[in-house]
Regions:
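An N-terminal-biased, well-structured beta-alpha scaffold segment characteristic
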Residues: 2-114, 118-120
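Short, acidic/small-residue loops that bind anionic groups at enzyme active sites
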Residues: 122-127
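Conserved small/polar residues in nucleotide/adenosyl-binding loops
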Residues: 131-138
Length: 138
C-alpha cells in the first residue's frame, strides 16, 4: 500500500498529517510513504527527517495523488491555485482519503458529492472520539 502526504494548501494551515515518527512506523510495517517536499516545514519537520524515516519525497502534489492508495491530510481538499485544479480532481477512483471533512456543514456538501462522483472513499475525523483511558461515556 502506498500512503500519500501532500502539503496542506489552506491559507494559514501549518500542520502536516504525518510526522517523521509516524512515517517511520508506517515504513516499518512495509508501507510506502510519499511525502510532498516541504509538507512538514510549517510544523518544523524538515524533508531530511522524512527521508531518514524512509519516506520518498515528491516534488509535485499531483504525483502524490496519482500514486497513493491512501491520502492523509489535515484539512479538506481545496482548489490548488498553483496547479490550476482542485485536489479532488487529482484523486482517483478507489483512493482513500482520511482528513477533517466536516461533511455536515452545508458549504461542504458539494465537495462530498464531488468526491463520491470521483469514486474517492473518504473517512472524516470530525466524528471520531479518541480516548487514551476509559471515560464515563464508555
Amino acid at each position: 500500500m502506498i500512503i500519500g502526504v501532500p502539503k496542506e494548501i489552506m491559507s494559514g494551515e501549518d500542520r502536516v498529517a504525518a510526522t517523521p515518527e509516524t512515517v517511520a512506523d508506517m515504513v516499518g510495517k512495509g508501507l510506502t510513504v510519499l511525502v510532498e517536499k516541504g509538507a512538514g516545514e510549517g510544523s518544523f519537520f524538515h524533508d531530511p527527517e522524512y527521508v531518514s524515516a524512509g519516506a520518498e519525497m515528491v516534488d509535485d502534489p499531483e504525483e502524490v495523488y496519482q500514486r497513493a492508495d491512501l491520502i492523509l491530510k489535515v484539512k479538506e481538499p481545496l482548489y490548488n491555485e498553483a496547479k490550476g485544479r482542485s485536489e479532488i480532481s487529482m484523486m482517483h477512483k478507489g483512493q482513500y482519503l482520511i482528513t477533517f471533512i466536516h461533511p455536515a456543514a452545508p458549504p461542504n456538501h458539494e465537495m462530498v458529492k464531488e468526491m463520491a462522483a470521483q469514486g474517492v472513499i473518504s473517512l472524516t475525523l470530525d466524528g471520531c472520539l479518541l480516548y487514551t483511558s476509559p471515560s464515563p461515556r464508555d
